[in-house]
Amino acid sequence: MRLFRFLFKLCFLLLVLVGFAYLFLAIFYFGSLNPFELAQPMDVFNRFFSKEALDNISSNNGATATAQTSSLLQLLEGSSNGLDNRFPTEKSAFYAIPGYVDFLKNAKLPGFVEQFTPYLTKYVIPLGMAFVSGLIGTLIVNFFLNKITRSIKRRKRNMKKQEQEEYYDDSRSRRKRN
Protein backbone atom coordinates (compact mmCIF):
# COMPACT_ATOMS: atom_id res chain seq x y z
CA MET A 1 0.00 0.00 0.00
CA ARG A 2 2.85 2.38 0.79
CA LEU A 3 4.45 1.65 -2.58
CA PHE A 4 1.18 2.48 -4.37
CA ARG A 5 0.87 5.77 -2.44
CA PHE A 6 4.49 6.60 -3.22
CA LEU A 7 4.05 5.89 -6.95
CA PHE A 8 0.81 7.87 -7.06
CA LYS A 9 2.47 10.85 -5.34
CA LEU A 10 5.49 10.59 -7.65
CA CYS A 11 3.27 10.59 -10.77
CA PHE A 12 1.24 13.49 -9.42
CA LEU A 13 4.38 15.53 -8.69
CA LEU A 14 5.76 14.75 -12.16
CA LEU A 15 2.53 16.08 -13.69
CA VAL A 16 2.83 19.18 -11.52
CA LEU A 17 6.45 19.61 -12.67
CA VAL A 18 5.42 19.39 -16.34
CA GLY A 19 2.56 21.82 -15.70
CA PHE A 20 4.77 24.41 -14.05
CA ALA A 21 7.42 24.01 -16.76
CA TYR A 22 4.76 24.54 -19.45
CA LEU A 23 3.42 27.63 -17.67
CA PHE A 24 6.95 28.97 -17.39
CA LEU A 25 7.53 28.55 -21.13
CA ALA A 26 4.06 29.75 -22.11
CA ILE A 27 4.22 32.90 -19.98
CA PHE A 28 7.86 33.95 -19.78
CA TYR A 29 9.39 32.57 -22.96
CA PHE A 30 6.48 33.06 -25.35
CA GLY A 31 4.90 36.18 -24.07
CA SER A 32 1.82 37.23 -22.30
CA LEU A 33 0.33 36.91 -18.83
CA ASN A 34 -3.10 37.20 -20.44
CA PRO A 35 -4.63 33.69 -20.29
CA PHE A 36 -6.27 34.21 -23.69
CA GLU A 37 -2.87 34.85 -25.30
CA LEU A 38 -1.01 31.98 -23.64
CA ALA A 39 0.85 29.67 -25.96
CA GLN A 40 -1.01 26.40 -26.38
CA PRO A 41 0.80 23.19 -25.36
CA MET A 42 1.27 22.11 -28.99
CA ASP A 43 2.68 25.54 -29.88
CA VAL A 44 5.27 25.14 -27.14
CA PHE A 45 6.04 21.60 -28.26
CA ASN A 46 6.28 22.57 -31.95
CA ARG A 47 8.52 25.53 -31.15
CA PHE A 48 11.15 23.17 -29.76
CA PHE A 49 10.58 19.75 -31.29
CA SER A 50 8.68 20.06 -34.58
CA LYS A 51 10.31 18.80 -37.77
CA GLU A 52 10.73 22.38 -39.01
CA ALA A 53 12.42 23.46 -35.78
CA LEU A 54 14.76 20.47 -35.86
CA ASP A 55 15.46 20.93 -39.58
CA ASN A 56 16.28 24.58 -38.92
CA ILE A 57 19.19 23.63 -36.70
CA SER A 58 20.39 20.74 -38.87
CA SER A 59 20.18 22.84 -42.06
CA ASN A 60 22.33 25.50 -40.42
CA ASN A 61 25.29 23.13 -40.14
CA GLY A 62 24.10 21.69 -36.86
CA ALA A 63 26.42 22.08 -33.93
CA THR A 64 29.11 23.79 -36.00
CA ALA A 65 27.01 26.91 -36.59
CA THR A 66 27.07 29.62 -33.97
CA ALA A 67 23.86 31.30 -32.86
CA GLN A 68 24.78 34.41 -34.83
CA THR A 69 25.46 32.42 -38.00
CA SER A 70 22.22 30.48 -37.58
CA SER A 71 20.13 33.62 -37.21
CA LEU A 72 21.82 35.23 -40.24
CA LEU A 73 21.26 32.12 -42.35
CA GLN A 74 17.63 32.04 -41.33
CA LEU A 75 17.20 35.70 -42.27
CA LEU A 76 18.82 35.01 -45.65
CA GLU A 77 16.52 32.05 -46.22
CA GLY A 78 13.58 34.34 -45.45
CA SER A 79 11.62 32.23 -43.02
CA SER A 80 7.85 32.55 -43.24
CA ASN A 81 7.32 34.51 -40.04
CA GLY A 82 10.78 36.03 -39.73
CA LEU A 83 11.09 34.58 -36.24
CA ASP A 84 14.10 32.60 -35.12
CA ASN A 85 12.51 29.88 -33.05
CA ARG A 86 15.56 29.54 -30.81
CA PHE A 87 15.02 32.94 -29.19
CA PRO A 88 12.20 34.35 -27.06
CA THR A 89 9.45 36.31 -28.78
CA GLU A 90 9.51 40.12 -28.58
CA LYS A 91 6.58 40.31 -26.17
CA SER A 92 8.04 37.78 -23.73
CA ALA A 93 9.51 38.57 -20.33
CA PHE A 94 12.90 37.20 -21.40
CA TYR A 95 13.08 39.59 -24.31
CA ALA A 96 12.72 42.48 -21.85
CA ILE A 97 15.84 41.43 -19.91
CA PRO A 98 18.57 43.81 -21.06
CA GLY A 99 21.23 42.00 -23.05
CA TYR A 100 19.65 38.53 -22.80
CA VAL A 101 18.79 38.10 -26.48
CA ASP A 102 21.99 39.88 -27.53
CA PHE A 103 23.96 37.42 -25.43
CA LEU A 104 22.17 34.51 -27.08
CA LYS A 105 22.73 35.90 -30.57
CA ASN A 106 26.32 37.06 -30.06
CA ALA A 107 27.53 34.74 -27.35
CA LYS A 108 31.21 35.16 -26.50
CA LEU A 109 31.86 31.60 -25.47
CA PRO A 110 34.97 29.40 -25.45
CA GLY A 111 35.55 27.47 -28.68
CA PHE A 112 34.53 24.07 -27.36
CA VAL A 113 31.20 25.51 -26.14
CA GLU A 114 30.60 27.66 -29.24
CA GLN A 115 30.02 24.64 -31.47
CA PHE A 116 26.99 23.76 -29.31
CA THR A 117 25.55 27.30 -29.25
CA PRO A 118 22.48 26.57 -31.42
CA TYR A 119 21.52 23.75 -29.07
CA LEU A 120 22.38 25.86 -26.03
CA THR A 121 20.11 28.72 -27.09
CA LYS A 122 17.31 26.53 -28.47
CA TYR A 123 17.13 23.75 -25.90
CA VAL A 124 19.41 24.00 -22.88
CA ILE A 125 18.66 27.54 -21.66
CA PRO A 126 14.85 27.69 -22.07
CA LEU A 127 14.13 24.05 -21.24
CA GLY A 128 16.62 24.13 -18.36
CA MET A 129 14.95 27.24 -16.93
CA ALA A 130 11.53 25.63 -17.42
CA PHE A 131 12.69 22.48 -15.64
CA VAL A 132 14.11 24.45 -12.72
CA SER A 133 10.94 26.53 -12.38
CA GLY A 134 8.86 23.35 -12.59
CA LEU A 135 11.04 21.77 -9.91
CA ILE A 136 10.63 24.78 -7.64
CA GLY A 137 6.86 24.74 -8.16
CA THR A 138 6.76 21.00 -7.48
CA LEU A 139 8.74 21.41 -4.25
CA ILE A 140 6.31 24.10 -3.10
CA VAL A 141 3.29 21.90 -3.92
CA ASN A 142 4.96 18.93 -2.19
CA PHE A 143 5.62 21.06 0.91
CA PHE A 144 1.95 22.02 1.19
CA LEU A 145 0.80 18.44 0.51
CA ASN A 146 3.04 17.22 3.34
CA LYS A 147 1.68 19.91 5.68
CA ILE A 148 -1.91 18.91 4.87
CA THR A 149 -1.31 15.16 5.28
CA ARG A 150 0.56 15.70 8.57
CA SER A 151 -2.27 17.79 9.98
CA ILE A 152 -4.82 15.12 8.95
CA LYS A 153 -2.74 12.37 10.56
CA ARG A 154 -2.28 14.47 13.72
CA ARG A 155 -6.02 15.12 13.91
CA LYS A 156 -6.80 11.40 13.54
CA ARG A 157 -4.23 10.53 16.20
CA ASN A 158 -5.68 13.09 18.61
CA MET A 159 -9.22 11.82 18.00
CA LYS A 160 -8.11 8.24 18.68
CA LYS A 161 -6.33 9.32 21.86
CA GLN A 162 -9.40 11.22 23.01
CA GLU A 163 -11.64 8.20 22.38
CA GLN A 164 -9.32 6.01 24.43
CA GLU A 165 -9.27 8.54 27.27
CA GLU A 166 -13.07 8.69 27.27
CA TYR A 167 -13.29 4.90 27.25
CA TYR A 168 -11.01 4.49 30.25
CA ASP A 169 -12.31 7.55 32.07
CA ASP A 170 -15.47 5.72 33.08
CA SER A 171 -16.25 5.60 36.79
CA ARG A 172 -16.90 1.86 36.61
CA SER A 173 -14.07 -0.51 37.17
CA ARG A 174 -12.52 -2.34 34.22
CA ARG A 175 -13.73 -5.75 35.36
CA LYS A 176 -17.37 -4.70 35.25
CA ARG A 177 -16.88 -3.15 31.84
CA ASN A 178 -15.76 -6.42 30.25
UniProtKB/Swiss-Prot annotation:
- List where Basic and acidic residues composition bias occurs: 160-172
Does the keyword section mention Nucleotide-binding? Answer: no
Query: Per the database entry, which stretches of residues form a coiled coil?
Result: none
Per UniProt, the keywords (alphabetical) are: Cell membrane, Membrane, Transmembrane, Transmembrane helix
Chain segments annotated as transmembrane:
10-30, 124-144
Instruction: Look up the domain of life of the source.
Output: Bacteria
Where is it found, in Gene Ontology cellular component terms? plasma membrane
Major localization listed first in the record, in broad terms: membrane
> Which subcellular locations apply to this protein?
Cell membrane
Where are the residues of the annotated region Disordered? 155-178
Lipid bilayer topology: Multi-pass membrane protein
Keyword flag Cell membrane: yes
What's the protein name? Uncharacterized protein MG319
